[in-house]
UniProtKB/Swiss-Prot annotation:
Keywords: Disulfide bond, Glycoprotein, Hydrolase, Lipid degradation, Lipid metabolism, Secreted, Signal, Virulence. The keyword Manganese does not apply. It catalyses: a triacylglycerol + H2O = a diacylglycerol + a fatty acid + H(+); a monoacylglycerol + H2O = glycerol + a fatty acid + H(+); a diacylglycerol + H2O = a monoacylglycerol + a fatty acid + H(+). The gene is LIP1. Residues 469-480 have a biased composition (Basic residues). Pfam families: LIP. GO terms for cellular component: extracellular region. Glycans are attached at N183, N316. Belongs to the AB hydrolase superfamily. Lipase family. Class Lip subfamily. Disulfide bonds join C119-C288. This is Secreted triacylglycerol lipase LIP1. Inhibited by different metal ions including Fe(2+), Fe(3+), Cu(2+), and Zn(2+). The monovalent ions Na(+) and K(+) exhibit less dramatic inhibition. The active site is at S201, D348, H382. Induction: Not expressed in laboratory conditions.
């Protein structure tokens, strides 16, 4: 019988899913294919990965408040799709805090986990798109890095087709977002800039693949470490884990993603979908995470509701090859070559723990440096582990930037931590709470944090700027973007 705390976690997850569509009637406020910024110029395919095709300065919109970063830019850049031989393009958003360190860059990976164009990080920062509550959470955890003075680059790592679950593509696009950011002369980044990455859940798909592909695809990048948790390292394993659960809509989103970028998968899927299946994929292409989950809970991909082959729907050589290609850790040459910090709840209800643990073990056998923390308490789930693990993940990256050596080899440890027990969290408690409360408004920079009361103005920054913190209803008004568009 579930405990009261287990029921509380379930109620909390459902509350978040139900709450944000109510906030986010701005979810219908789509980016729009007619936005000229997202259209690449002629001959873009002849450019090199990481080459900037276009850029603009933006006034970033933040869902929970106005964070007074010093500058923000968006870059359209050349990248790759499923292989290095398939040209593609996408966008990254750069956030520059006050007194930014010009020799440090952090790539932040958002758990978009959906296929609608309004769900991308760039749409969130440009249009204040509130339709993806996970973006709201990730935005909050990025505060720790910005507060430290780290410049952040946050790619639309699902590409223009918003191909959720196409992990290799996400890895290429993330590595090329780093290249593009380093190429952006306005930042004046040092030639020896050190780089790290942070992400969770869908963001860990991205960084798991970026860390795996970096040695062969982008060996020149001075990446010093990665932190990611709740890692969906095996696509088929994740599908089987959430099939028939309240999170089963994620399966349709993932099928939509790989269908839209793998032509051979698209060809097969079209032969097995029924009308409800085609409708489901089209719904996913136009909506964000919580809308998809609320539309398709407790569904089984192996039933005949969406397709005509039942439990044999994935019993196809092409599909099986794709699942193999999208499993981390099975190819020795795709092993991270810098330290990695991973964390995962043993009882994760969305992403299977065993798959992530197996990937970490495989990487270790091939010479990686992996520090893996298991949160074993039976009350620790996917969302609570994201919060609890965010501070150790940040400390791991900060220690690397501060020159702390990471011991050779791998280290697997278990913590019987319960998030709501402050004595267990110890010193982490205030930092976690501050990071979450920070969403209500603060000046971002290493000189110190100022939490602003709602509807107040805090003045006196070095740059002469001020921080306005709005009430919730004020923050969620759509404001015309003030941006400068330049061709590279």
């Amino acid at each position: 019988m579930p405990s009261m705390l287990s029921l509380f976690y379930l109620a909390q997850s459902l509350f978040l899913l139900l709450l944000f569509p109510l906030y986010g009637h701005a979810s219908v406020l789509k980016r729009g294919n007619n936005d000229p910024f997202y259209q690449p110029p002629a001959h873009w395919k002849s450019k090199q990965p990481g080459d900037i095709l276009r850029w603009r300065k933006i006034e970033p919109k933040f869902i929970g408040g106005d964070f007074n970063v010093a500058e923000a830019y968006q870059l359209l850049y050349r990248t790759s799709q499923n292989t290095p031989n398939e040209p593609q393009h996408t966008v990254t958003t750069i956030l520059v805090p006050h007194n930014a360190k010009k020799d440090i860059l952090v790539v932040g990976s958002v758990a978009q986990d959906a296929n609608g164009q309004q769900c991308t990080p760039s749409a969130g920062y440009t249009y204040n798109s509130e339709s993806n509550f996970v973006f709201w959470l990730d935005e909050t955890f990025f505060l720790q890095y910005l507060q430290e003075g780290y410049i952040m680059t946050i790619p639309d790592k699902e590409g223009p087709k918003n191909a959720f679950a196409a992990g290799r593509m996400e890895g290429y696009m993330t590595l090329d977002s780093i290249r593009a950011t380093l190429n952006f002369s306005k930042l004046k980044l040092s030639s020896n800039t050190r780089i790290a990455g942070y992400g969770y859940s869908g963001g860990a798909i991205t960084l798991g693949w970026a860390s795996s592909l970096k040695p062969s695809y982008a060996p020149e990048l001075n990446i010093i470490g990665w932190s990611f948790g709740g890692t969906p390292s095996n696509l088929l394993g994740t599908i089987n884990h959430i099939d028939g659960t309240i999170f089963s809509g994620l399966i349709l989103a993932g099928v939509t993603g790989v269908t839209d970028v793998y032509p051979e998968i698209h060809e097969y899927i079209q032969t097995v979908l029924n009308s409800a299946g085609r409708e489901g994929l089209e719904f996913c292409r136009n909506h964000c995470l919580q809308e998809i989950i609320l539309r398709y809970p407790l569904k089984s991909i192996y039933s005949y509701e969406f397709q005509t082959r039942g439990k044999d729907v994935f019993n196809n050589a092409t599909v099986q090859q794709m699942f193999t290609d999208l499993t981390m850790g099975i190819r020795p040459h795709e092993t991270p070559d810098v330290p990695v910090f991973m964390y995962h709840a043993q009882h994760d209800e969305i992403v299977p723990y065993d798959d992530a643990h197996k990937t970490a073990k495989a990487w270790c056998r091939n010479g990686a440096q992996v520090k893996f923390t298991t949160y074993s308490h039976y009350e620790m789930g996917h969302f609570t582990t994201e919060i609890t693990g965010s501070v150790p993940a940040f400390h791991f990256i900060r220690d690397l930037f501060n020159g702390k050596e990471v011991s050779q080899g791998c280290d697997f440890k278990t913590e019987d931590t319960l998030f709501f027990n402050p004595s267990v969290l110890g010193g982490n408690a205030n930092e976690i709470i501050d990071a979450i409360l920070g969403i209500f408004g603060q000046r971002i920079g290493p000189e110190g944090r100022i939490l602003a009361a709602k509807k107040t103005v805090v003045k006196g920054s070095k740059s002469g700027s001020s921080l306005k913190s709005h009430s919730h209803s004020q923050t969620h008004k759509h404001r015309k973007d003030v941006s400068t568009i330049s061709n590279a």
